[in-house]
UniProtKB/Swiss-Prot annotation:
It comes from the Viruses. The keyword Transmembrane applies. This is Large envelope protein. Residues 2-174 are annotated as: Pre-S. Glycans are attached at residue 320. Interacts (via its myristoylated pre-S1 region) with the host SLC10A1/NTCP; this interaction is essential for viral entry. The large envelope protein is synthesized with the pre-S region at the cytosolic side of the endoplasmic reticulum and, hence will be within the virion after budding. Therefore the pre-S region is not N-glycosylated. Later a post-translational translocation of N-terminal pre-S and TM1 domains occur in about 50% of proteins at the virion surface. These molecules change their topology by an unknown mechanism, resulting in exposure of pre-S region at virion surface. The gene is S. Residues 120-174 are annotated as: Pre-S2. The lineage of its organism: Viruses, Riboviria, Pararnavirae, Artverviricota, Revtraviricetes. Residues 2-253, 203-253, 370-375 are intravirion. Residues 2-119 are annotated as: Pre-S1. Its main location: virion.
Amino acid sequence: MGGWSSKPRKGMGTNLSVPNPLGFFPDHQLDPAFKANSENPDWDLNPHKDNWPDANKVGVGAFGPGFTPPHGGLLGWSPQAQGLLTTVPAAPPPASTNRQSGRQPTPLSPPLRDTHPQAMQWNSTTFHQTLQDPRVRALYFPAGGSSSGTVSPAQNTVSTISSILSKTGDPVPNMENIASGLLGPLLVLQAGFFLLTKILTIPQSLDSWWTSLNFLGGTPVCLGQNSQSQISSHSPTCCPPICPGYRWMCLRRFIIFLCILLLCLIFLLVLLDYQGMLPVCPLIPGSSTTSTGPCKTCTTPAQGTSMFPSCCCTKPTDGNCTCIPIPSSWAFAKYLWEWASVRFSWLSLLVPFVQWFVGLSPTVWLSVIWMMWFWGPSLYNILSPFMPLLPIFFCLWVYI
């Protein structure tokens, strides 16, 4: 019983041809997968068995405490299973043999605009226009809305769609134009924000200049503070709300804002008049009333042609309407001067003085230039707050 016998023994765990040292694996002859039957009752006599050549290799600890199967470790007899790492060199790729024969490299394809010109003309606009075409809609939506209907022949369909695709669609949008179109408004917003911050400093600068006129040669100090008020010494342009001079500061800045708005309004009126968009009619000697209106109501047309309304209609005593052209420039100033001369007769006395000043000698003009040079820095300090308004006036002059 204890010795080894070459004769296979039957029973559970007694087939020594199969590694079963622990003796708890069932006998293979009972397993239908190995085709055990009454004709082949023994595993060793089964012609369809797997001989397992590695079964005869006895590993370390096969029958000892390590419980290592005789055919090697739990992972097999390979060096990796035994814990030895070996580097297997990768096989080099096979040499190419199609250099001289076989498949040749694919040549470069011609541009799409040459091979498929209709694809360059197709976009979403022409696609929707094609769908709205009655001939195309008849292909998918027969008459009456039902599935029954007469479909055009295939050759007519192809010719119809080809004729529609041959139409030139809208040009493809250029990304450069889109980028430049977005960059322009961003630069305008940045410049506008910068000018706005500068314009907001104009009232404070003009307020400082206004208050400095009362403190020539000294530091402006608010006169509203007294011994009873617990207010520290401060500038009259930065009065707190509890200071008695606060209301005067607000009044000065309100007047300054009105002056700035009046200046902008005058510039806008002069600009509109320069563009011929301001129908100001000058007073004509001998005419009692004037009225503005289209030139087609006049019996005598105005001289010259213009795309802007450039004529005034007068009504003399005979009842006929006569049109006169509006001056292209300085009509507003001329109108104001004539209007003021009619109501204030003493302004006519200034005309000879202006004419005399214009006819002065060059020596007088040089003296005036010298005075401007001498008073230039002071004038610059006065006019410097208005410098941010110059770019705005320039943009209005160019784009209006």
